[in-house]
């Protein structure tokens, strides 16, 4: 009997021990949940504070004296500054130190960048350069005047040239070797006005105006230079026609996504092999300007309100409107910076908006403002204006 009683006691003790262990585990789990919830709440509070915070001034961290830059244009390229004019191009860091430069003579220099490569070409001329962060990779001379050029992420360039009523699209690799060529005859009433090259250089789109029917239609043709396109006539993997619409601009924003901007809509095409129309964003009226990067697209409309010269709307590529704001700045440019913020730049004033519609920063300057660029780090920017280039931190 004693043994049986002892067995019950041991069994009871084990049950009590297991219950104590369960209670202890529950306490630990509750503490972990409380700590995690507190950390998440703190993170959200900090994130909201940062997202909604506005700035009215800045500290100058570094200032570089600049000569007259009235005839110079500026581009943000790989975190440094490209300055270009009719006489050449200069690539400097934020301290004003020269990384490289290239002299040339162009009547209308244009710069296009894609990740770590860029091209500078003379619109209406015959000169084109392929460049990267180290300098010139290749200089290409075309036989006929250049209408448009674009570049892919590995340095491949597509060039639209014209001679009389004939138009040619040529593809060159980073070493200047011709990879492909196509001809479009103006006498057939299809006149190319723009081209777009995917980041991987495997797909090319040609935007044409069709005036054969006595009215203005637009035609976009897609070409694939990979294995899929080799099975199609002239590598053509799709053509879209838009009646009574003028499409002046097309652009690839990734390997597989292209946008087309018409006088009525913005069309978004997707497809790694054969692009298909994914989304159409209806425009309220004629836009003054359009700006985009690989995540978002924005438009600016004229505003009849004397206090607000323009109305800005921002969309994702699914057509969802993310923000809209009015600006009183008579802007020279509206663009995304490398931090996905919207920068509005006027002669002597600028604004920075977040994609959530918060006016993060507004400032007026004593001198003419040429360029506003984001610099890596929290609230770091570069202001380029008449007489100086300043690296600043908002406060």
Predicted feature locations:
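N-terminal Lys/Arg-rich, disordered targeting/topogenic segments
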Residues: 1-30
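Structured, soluble extracytoplasmic/luminal domains of envelope-associated proteins
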Residues: 99-154, 278-281, 288-306, 310-314
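Hydrophobic membrane-insertion alpha-helices, especially the h-region
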Residues: 30-49
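Repeated scaffold domains used in trafficking and secretory/extracellular systems
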Residues: 67-76, 105-116, 144-155, 188-197, ...
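Structural motif
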Residues: 88-90, 126-130, 165-171, 212-224, ...
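Hydrophobic beta-strand positions that form the internal "hydrophobic ladder"
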Residues: 80-81, 118, 156-158, 201-204, ...
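Solenoidal tandem-repeat scaffolds enriched in leucines and small polar residues
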Residues: 167-265
């Amino acid at each position: 009997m004693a043994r049986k009683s002892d067995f019950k006691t041991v069994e009871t003790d084990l049950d009590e021990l297991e219950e104590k262990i369960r209670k202890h585990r529950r306490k630990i789990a509750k503490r972990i949940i409380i700590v995690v919830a507190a950390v998440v709440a703190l993170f959200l509070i900090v994130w909201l504070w940062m997202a909604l915070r506005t700035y009215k001034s800045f500290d100058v961290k570094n200032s570089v004296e600049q000569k007259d830059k009235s005839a110079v244009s500026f581009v943000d390229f790989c975190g440094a500054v490209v300055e270009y004019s009719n006489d050449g191009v200069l690539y400097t860091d934020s301290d004003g130190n020269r990384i490289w430069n290239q002299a040339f003579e162009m009547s209308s220099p244009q710069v296009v960048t894609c990740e770590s490569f860029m091209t500078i070409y003379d619109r209406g001329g015959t000169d084109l350069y392929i460049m990267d962060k180290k300098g010139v990779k290749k200089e290409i001379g075309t036989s006929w005047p250049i209408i448009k050029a674009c570049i892919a992420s590995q340095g491949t360039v597509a060039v639209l040239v014209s001679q009389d009523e004939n138009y040619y699209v040529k593809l060159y690799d980073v070493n200047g070797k011709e990879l492909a060529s196509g001809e479009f005859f103006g006498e057939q009433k299809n006149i190319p006005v723009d081209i777009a090259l995917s980041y991987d250089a495997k797909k090319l789109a040609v935007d044409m105006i069709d005036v054969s029917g006595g009215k203005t239609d637009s035609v976009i043709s897609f070409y694939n230079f990979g294995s899929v396109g080799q099975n199609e006539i002239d590598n053509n993997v799709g053509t879209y026609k838009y009646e009574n619409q003028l499409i002046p601009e097309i652009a690839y924003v990734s390997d597989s996504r292209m946008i087309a901007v018409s006088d009525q809509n913005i069309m978004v095409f997707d497809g790694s092999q054969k692009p298909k129309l994914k989304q159409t964003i209806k425009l309220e009226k004629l836009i003054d300007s359009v700006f985009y990067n690989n995540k978002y697209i924005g438009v600016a409309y004229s505003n009849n309100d004397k206090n607000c010269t323009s109305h800005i709307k921002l969309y994702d590529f699914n057509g969802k409107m993310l923000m809209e704001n009015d600006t009183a700045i008579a802007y020279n440019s509206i663009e995304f910076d490398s931090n996905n913020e919207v920068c509005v730049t006027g002669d002597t004033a600028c604004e920075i908006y977040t994609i959530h519609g918060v006016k993060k920063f507004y400032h007026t300057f004593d001198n003419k403002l040429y360029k506003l660029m984001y610099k890596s780090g929290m609230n770091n920017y570069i202001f380029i204006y008449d007489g100086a280039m300043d690296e600043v931190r908002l406060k």
